[in-house]
Amino acid sequence: PELFKSYFIVFKDYNFGRYMLTSTIVSLGTVIITLIFAIPAAYAVARLNFFGKNFLSTSILIIYLFPAIVLVIPLYTIFSQLGLRNSIEGLLIVYTATTLPVAIYMLQGYFKSIPKELEEAGIIDGQNWLGIIFKIILPLSLPAISSVALYVFMIAWNEFLFSLMF
């Protein structure tokens, strides 16, 4: 029908499907890499006691205060020297670095809301720390992890400045 003619032209003549696939790969890759790093970091900041914990906790969001345009020239220079311009790997690095602070911040708030008594019950039941994280904390955190995953996907999908520069 005439109604969908423009869509057929865009996908057929302008290779739009390939661009959509690339955007999907980059966005999903960013989500996966960000969650791999954000979950242990947020758990550490929320639960473990270490020197500089408060400073680290507050500085996570301070990083997010810098506008992206300030980072473009230094990153462009570094990525040119490393040969990461015009590559999916380069975008994954930049997108992960820009979404990691907000992912850690969101997850640490949720991890703090989980009662410590559940972890203590896991220790009594014979679980080690990895067992506690994988069998108690992560299943209880699935709503927060899904929210963070959707938010990171949205940020990566809508980001244009870095994809234009790199």
What is each residue range found by the language model?
Residues 1-166:
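A structural signal for multi-pass alpha-helical bundles of membrane permease subunits
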